[in-house]
Amino acid sequence: LLFSFRIKSEGNAAHISAKNLIGSETEKIRTVNRVAGYLADHYQESSSLDELASRFFTNKFYLTRIFKQVTGFTIREYLHIQRVQKAQEFLRSSLLPITEIALMVGFENVSYFEKIFRRYCMQSPREYRVSQKAESH
């Protein structure tokens, strides 16, 4: 199991595994896991593809290809997922304004944050917060 993420709700977890990849792919999987771990830890930063490739001693085109091959996501999609997950945590556990949460998780533009959040959660951040409050009562 490479990593997992929750998008719609805590009960619906999607898992990404490497079981379909052959043994000679081990180094690709390790590289992708290291990059995914870095992105998960540094989700609020905006690293360029060139910076990521340099950090992990690889070519940006190769990194892009293997990341998508192993995870099924582009690097940008994976970073968005990490940011949305963190935003979900803040929306559930705090009363911080949505604008502040967007900035805290790495989105510079609140409208873009709301668009990405809606893409992965099928509801706006405000709707998500209200639904989580209703479920906990």
Which role fits each region the language model picked out?
Residues 21, 38-84, 96, 102-127:
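Basic/polar phosphate-binding segments, predominantly the helix-turn-helix DNA-binding elements
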Residues 28-36, 80-88:
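Short, leucine-enriched amphipathic alpha-helices that occur as contiguous helical runs
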Residues 2-9, 39, 67, 91:
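Hydrophobic recognition helices of helix-based DNA-binding modules
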Residues 28, 57, 91:
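Charged, low-complexity surface patches
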Residues 1-23, 27-31, 62:
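An amphipathic alpha-helical interaction segment
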Residues 130-137:
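Generic C-terminal helix-cap and adjacent flexible tail
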Residues 87, 121, 137:
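Short Asp/Glu-rich motifs
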